[in-house]
């Protein structure tokens, strides 16, 4: 088997808080991978002309529900795509109709953060990459020398100077921060629907383009076209602390609106959601590496979420990709001020700066954080298997609007940002120990007595997840052969997860443990994954502020590791970490090798139901892409 790591030798790993060294093999065995080399994952694809509630849509506005595009997912659901009633890419926003963004559904951002408007949006050209003579290399923040830090400070300082001398200049610091505010807090609408680049498949490409121009602006301000934006290397033990260069008062990189937990050399918790984990720093490091393995290997073997809903823009279902879920959101929260605390200006905190989308860009660290998020996109694809970019044309042809380093407006497409080297930059080669950090069984030996805990039918629907709960659930099949596993993936699905979208949300899922599990230790095979959500505006005008989501976890590998393959019934434990959550139901399903289109094409009025026609095409495309046999 080919190595999944970027180097061929073993990685010598020092813990961030001790001088001890652990050797992590860079060439995992087949059992270390979620997608075993001989597996050929296949999925049932069902295309229905139904609305979100499963009823016939009287307006012929068709939902892309039940289109299965893969198990696990880096990108998330296409739930924020302004398509109206037919399939179409997301167009760039109309800057002339930008609304005042909101911190939440009722509170407006205290300043106007819409981008400067070009004279004529219809004449804004598509961006063309300049010729590349030398790649810009983005370095890890913890390894920068004093000269590089000084150059970085100078670039940010000059960017901030423009806020005073030319406040409407689109390359100024506040104007750059406003980009995230407008795109992420309800500033732009298309056909009456709020454009939201989070909790959707637009997350990675939007932020890549955002940082691309930001980096070029920094380089132009210091006359250095080779300047590379540093990345906060939080996925490696050496980078699991707050980068010191950002914590020097009086410098351009400093931001006073940050939480106290970043100081004193504290290690970052990549699963942080407002409460510090009571554990050792070494355990925190292993938790982080486990989370990275789960998010980039176990739960993201394919581009899109399992049983993915390619929904129309404006859906009430919100599903982020695995990396956006964790570690992206927890890092935002860990750096920002604690919600409800008092800010330096005397106002009550909404998580500013990093802990709220509208203000995140005001912290220079935001861009280094997202530089590493962007790097994860590359690292995920380098892991191999079916980890490739989406080929859906709606995604590839979706567009955004940005200003370049000269203040000129441009439109950009998703399809043009898939290769960083073609864009003119790359990342400094850095070890990725999480690739080999497959957790082992740590709970008590044997199977939990499922007869001593209630069945899922007596637990769900669950009105409030306010304490750890355990339940038993029947599997659709047990003692499956390897051939059956190759053809069908077992998926644990939590449906109708509801919560207030103004709150931080997290709960963890474990298999074969009871409700006394130590949920602060994640480096065990029994840990299946987590659901998280960062406060955001997804639907302006929703008085209930209620978000509805689904969590899907691939458990075939976990059942093998724990030794439960022959069991008809297994125990599942949920541990709430943050926020008020209700869950409608839970089930285990097998993803089946079969194409099922319940639409009768002979009765379609294609001029009215164009999307259903497109859906059938997508179904066939998926079959071809994943080597289905129909």
UniProtKB/Swiss-Prot annotation:
Q: Which Gene3D superfamilies does this one have?
A: Di-copper center containing domain from catechol oxidase
The Swiss-Prot or TrEMBL record describes its family as follows: Belongs to the tyrosinase family.
| Protein name (database record) | Polyphenol oxidase A, chloroplastic
What residues does Cu cation B bind to? Answer: 328, 332, 370
- Substrates-to-products reaction catalysed: 2 catechol + O2 = 2 1,2-benzoquinone + 2 H2O
In its keyword annotation, does this UniProt entry include Cell membrane?
no
Q: Which GO terms describe its molecular function?
A: catechol oxidase activity; metal ion binding
Give me the comment on cofactor binding. Answer: Binds 2 copper ions per subunit.
What is this protein's function per UniProt? Catalyzes the oxidation of mono- and o-diphenols to o-diquinones.
UniProt entry tagged with the keyword Cell wall biogenesis/degradation: no
What ranges does the record give for the region Disordered, renumbered to this chain? 1-25
């Amino acid at each position: 088997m080919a190595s999944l790591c970027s180097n061929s030798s073993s990685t010598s790993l020092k813990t961030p808080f001790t001088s001890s060294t652990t050797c992590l093999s860079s060439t995992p065995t087949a059992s270390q991978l979620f997608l075993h080399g001989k597996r050929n994952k296949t999925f049932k694809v069902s295309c229905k002309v139904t609305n979100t509630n499963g009823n016939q849509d009287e307006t012929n506005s068709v939902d892309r529900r039940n289109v299965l595009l893969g198990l696990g997912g880096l990108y998330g659901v296409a739930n924020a795509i302004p398509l109206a009633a037919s399939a179409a890419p997301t167009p760039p926003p109309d800057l002339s109709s930008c609304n005042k963004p909101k911190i939440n559904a009722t509170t407006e951002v205290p300043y106007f953060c819409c981008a400067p408007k070009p004279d004529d949006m219809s004449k804004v050209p598509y961006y063309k990459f300049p010729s590349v003579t030398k790649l810009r290399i983005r370095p890890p923040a913890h390894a920068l020398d004093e000269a590089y830090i000084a150059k970085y400070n100078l670039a940010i300082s000059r960017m901030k100077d423009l806020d005073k001398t030319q406040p409407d200049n689109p390359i100024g610091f506040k104007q750059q921060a406003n980009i995230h505010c407008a795109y992420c807090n309800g500033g732009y609408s298309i056909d009456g629907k709020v454009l939201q680049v989070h909790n959707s498949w637009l997350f990675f490409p939007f932020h890549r383009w955002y940082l691309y121009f930001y980096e070029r602006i920094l380089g132009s301000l210091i006359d250095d076209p080779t300047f590379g934006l540093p990345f906060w290397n939080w996925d490696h033990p050496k980078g699991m602390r707050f980068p010191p260069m950002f914590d020097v008062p009086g410098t351009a990189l400093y931001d006073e609106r940050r939480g106290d937990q970043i100081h004193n050399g504290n290690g970052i918790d990549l699963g942080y959601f407002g409460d510090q984990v009571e554990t050792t720093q070494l355990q925190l490091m292993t938790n982080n590496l486990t989370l990275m393995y789960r998010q980039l290997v176990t739960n993201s073997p394919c581009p899109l979420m399992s049983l993915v809903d390619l929904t129309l823009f404006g859906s009430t279902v919100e599903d982020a990709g695995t990396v956006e879920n964790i570690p992206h959101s927890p890092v935002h929260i860990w750096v920002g001020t604690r919600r409800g605390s008092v800010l330096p200006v005397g106002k009550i905190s909404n998580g500013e700066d990093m802990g709220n989308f509208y203000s995140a860009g005001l912290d220079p660290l935001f861009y280094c954080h997202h530089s590493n998020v962007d790097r994860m996109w590359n690292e995920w694809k380098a892991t191999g298997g079916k980890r490739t970019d989406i080929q859906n044309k709606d995604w590839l042809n979706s567009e955004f609007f940005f200003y370049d380093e000269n203040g000129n407006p441009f439109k950009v497409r998703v399809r043009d940002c898939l290769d960083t080297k073609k864009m003119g930059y790359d990342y400094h080669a850095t070890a990725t120990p999480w690739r080999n950090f497959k957790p082992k069984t740590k709970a008590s030996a044997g199977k939990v007595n499922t007869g001593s805990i209630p069945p899922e039918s007596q637990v769900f629907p669950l009105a409030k997840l306010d304490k750890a709960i355990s339940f038993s659930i029947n599997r659709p099949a047990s003692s499956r052969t390897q051939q059956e596993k190759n053809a069908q993936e077992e998926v644990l699905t939590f449906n109708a997860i509801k919560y207030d979208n103004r709150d931080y949300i997290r709960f963890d899922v474990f298999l074969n443990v009871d409700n006394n599990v130590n949920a602060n230790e994640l480096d065990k095979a029994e840990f299946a994954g987590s659901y998280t959500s960062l406060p955001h505006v997804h639907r302006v005008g929703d008085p209930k502020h209620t978000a509805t989501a689904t969590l899907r976890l691939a458990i075939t590998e976990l059942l093998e590791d724990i030794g439960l393959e022959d069991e008809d019934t297994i125990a599942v434990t949920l541990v709430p970490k943050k926020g008020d959550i209700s869950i409608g139901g839970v089930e285990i399903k097998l993803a089946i090798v079969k194409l099922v289109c319940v639409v009768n094409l002979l009765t379609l009025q294609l001029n009215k139901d164009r999307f259903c026609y497109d859906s059938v095409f997508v179904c066939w495309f998926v079959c071809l892409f994943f080597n289905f046999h129909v």
